Amino acid sequence: LDFKPDIVMDIRDWWMMEFEQRSPFRDFFHWAIMPTVDASPQNQQWINTYNSADSVFAYSEFGRDTMLEQCDTINFIDVASPAASDVFAPAADKKQHKANMGINPESIILGTVMRNQKRKLYPDLMASFRKFLDQTQDPNVFLYCHTYYPDVGWDFPKLIHENGLASRVLVTYKCKNCKKVSVDFFQNSIQNCQHCQSHTNYIKGIGAAETQKRE
């Protein structure tokens, strides 16, 4: 190694950090981890890894409780929640907020934030949304997918076409030219920007800044 860390901290999923448990240098650094715990129960192998860390943090009380219920010898320190930024506060006027984004103020939007990967059940999501629309017959309900396309996962145009959702699926676009974010119906991976009119608007997923999405 070109450096000798005293503390190694991992804030990521188990499969991205478990190798450090087996590191030949493990005895020479303090290992602090903050694993993503969003389901219960956790895989026992994951719990064994968490139990070997010197310090363990959680994103939420749910994560803390899940880990400690499965192993009460984990060196748990505290819940380290994200900063309480006003970016995450609800919009004061939802109808006006929708209007500012060019969306019908009376619309009902069901949203999801997840990367377009094969393990994410986008086909099930869109098929279920189609059934919901058929049952409710409500013209003002839309599915908002904050994700990436194209990516390593699903073929969005195919899923939308198969389920007849061309006018019901909204996505986040970000312009490479003016850097502004907009929300629009899925048309293609690239389209004209609503702000600067350049043909450089592309679907932007998890990396779009929260402040930009709020704008």
Language model regions located:
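A short, basic/aromatic alpha-helical/loop segment that forms part
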Residues: 117-122, 133, 138
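Donor nucleotide-sugar binding/catalytic pocket of nucleotide-sugar-dependent glycosyltransferases
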Residues: 52-93, 170-174
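Conserved donor-binding/catalytic core segment of Leloir-type glycosyltransferases
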Residues: 104-120, 126, 143-144
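A short helix/loop element that forms part of the nucleotide-sugar donor recognition site in Leloir-type
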Residues: 89-103
